[in-house]
């Protein structure tokens, strides 16, 4: 078994309650990056399109999905962090997120550029007209996993953050993507402390309403 999933292997099998959140990442590179800033929070690699989401434990305080994403809103630049206030999935489903503004404030405290808005999950990389359609519907960024993770939350609080790599003016299939990806990885590695402070406030009940 990969070391990326070891922290939860025993807890997930035995359903040992976890007092804090579980962080989910699609890719190992994302998991390794976010883990650098975490001191006590387990990270699970759920795979492309969350194909291994079944390994997520059912007994934890919250599910947090993190990683790289694409901007739909031109106001989001590469390296910015989009904190979802809702996660939109296929068929018009939408999962509200817990205390997104509080999480954004904690990220900003650490010197990161964070904004709040809807995140949409698609089943493929979107470009051109598809991006424009999603943006017109109010979504600010896109990924391929968060809604699938949220669907398994079973009533647990959910949060999602995506570090922007590409966008309307920064196409994914471009030589500059390599540099933007490396920069995004550095940003993702700095999100851990804010995530853990946010989770403490959430457990204490200081989160306020979902849109707060």
Regions found by a protein language model. Give the residues of each.
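Glycine-/acidic-rich phosphate or pyrophosphate-binding loops and their flanking alpha/beta elements
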Residues: 12-13
């Amino acid at each position: 078994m990969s070391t990326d999933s070891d922290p939860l292997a025993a807890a997930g099998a035995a359903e040992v309650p976890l007092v804090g959140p579980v962080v989910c990442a699609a890719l190992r590179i994302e998991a390794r990056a976010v883990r650098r800033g975490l001191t006590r929070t387990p990270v699970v690699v759920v795979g492309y399109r969350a194909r291994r989401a079944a390994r997520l434990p059912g007994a934890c305080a919250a599910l947090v999905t993190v990683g790289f994403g694409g901007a739909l809103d031109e106001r989001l630049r590469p390296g910015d962090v989009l904190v979802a206030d809702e996660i939109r999935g296929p068929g018009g489903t939408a999962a509200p997120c817990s205390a997104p503004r509080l999480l954004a404030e904690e990220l900003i405290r650490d010197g990161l550029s964070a904004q709040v808005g809807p995140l949409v999950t698609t089943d493929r990389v979107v470009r051109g007209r598809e991006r424009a359609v999603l943006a017109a519907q109010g979504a600010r960024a896109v990924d391929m996993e968060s809604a699938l993770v949220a669907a398994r939350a079973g009533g647990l609080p959910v949060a999602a953050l995506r570090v922007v790599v590409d966008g309307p003016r920064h196409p994914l299939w471009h030589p500059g993507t390599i540099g933007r990806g490396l920069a995004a990885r550095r940003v993702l590695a700095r999100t851990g402390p804010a995530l853990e402070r946010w989770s403490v406030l959430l457990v204490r009940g200081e989160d306020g309403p979902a849109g707060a």
